[in-house]
Amino acid sequence: MAQATPKADSQRGRFITFEGGEGSGKSTQIRILAERLQAAKLRAIVTREPGGSPGAEIIRHLVLSGVGKLLGADAETLLFAAARDDHVHTVIKPALEQGIWVLCDRFADSTRVYQGQLGNVLPGVLNAMERVTIGDLKPDLTVILDVPVEVGLQRAAARRGSGAPDRFEAEDIAFHRKLRDAYRAIAASDPQRCVVIDADADLDAVAARVWAALHDRALTADAATKASRA
């Protein structure tokens, strides 16, 4: 039986976000998914947070350099909010309105986890920032790539080679364990939007799980269904 086509708002692009700890493989899996969607004749762009737009990329440099941490969790949250506001209004929303799929490496859940759960920024502050920056924008699907902390940090170290760890990679092991737990809690609280995928496997196996998650939610079009059978 053929997979379901998109629902009533089929002219709107789909918004897929990828979340997870350091070294979980988000960037790689986003690239694989984008290539598969494009092969299925679906327009898709890849973007990231913090960053994704010229203004937001400037802020990305600041926060990953550690400047945000020196200013404190509330100020760092404001930096992320400023970056997200620019990103949403100049990249994400315009693309979705044109029927383009947007695949984003991190989004609002990362702020909830890093600055909220681990930085102790109050939920009221985060809610206010989301009202300003994203309004009613919500991902159609959030893929949370889950790997053991030690595996993720080893991958991150291998990826950067001789380079210094960024502001978040440099945190201690306890921080990263809390991070993993926080993402699992978000998934449990919003199972209709979120799917947790075991990413401690080879690239093809993880990519297949991501693709299956899209089908489970009837997000892919008939063209994508045909491509999956090729």
UniProtKB/Swiss-Prot annotation:
Q: Which top EC class is named for this enzyme in its record?
A: transferase
Keywords, comma-separated and alphabetical: ATP-binding, Kinase, Nucleotide biosynthesis, Nucleotide-binding, Transferase
Q: What is its EC number?
A: 2.7.4.9
Tell me, what's a Pfam family for it? Thymidylate_kin
User: CDD domains, from UniProt?
Assistant: TMPK
Q: Which PROSITE patterns match?
A: THYMIDYLATE_KINASE (PS01331)
Source domain of life is: Bacteria
Which molecular function terms from Gene Ontology are attached?
A: ATP binding; dTMP kinase activity
Give the UniProt record's GO annotations in the biological process aspect. Answer: dTDP biosynthetic process; dTTP biosynthetic process; dUDP biosynthetic process
Residues reported to bind ATP: G20, G21, E22, G23, S24, G25, K26, S27
This protein's GO CC annotations: cytosol
Q: Which Gene3D superfamilies match?
A: P-loop containing nucleotide triphosphate hydrolases
Q: Catalysed reaction(s)?
A: dTMP + ATP = dTDP + ADP
Function of the protein: Phosphorylation of dTMP to form dTDP in both de novo and salvage pathways of dTTP synthesis.
Family membership noted in the UniProt record? Belongs to the thymidylate kinase family.
- The entry's protein name is Thymidylate kinase
Q: Which organism is it from?
A: Nitrobacter winogradskyi (strain ATCC 25391 / DSM 10237 / CIP 104748 / NCIMB 11846 / Nb-255)
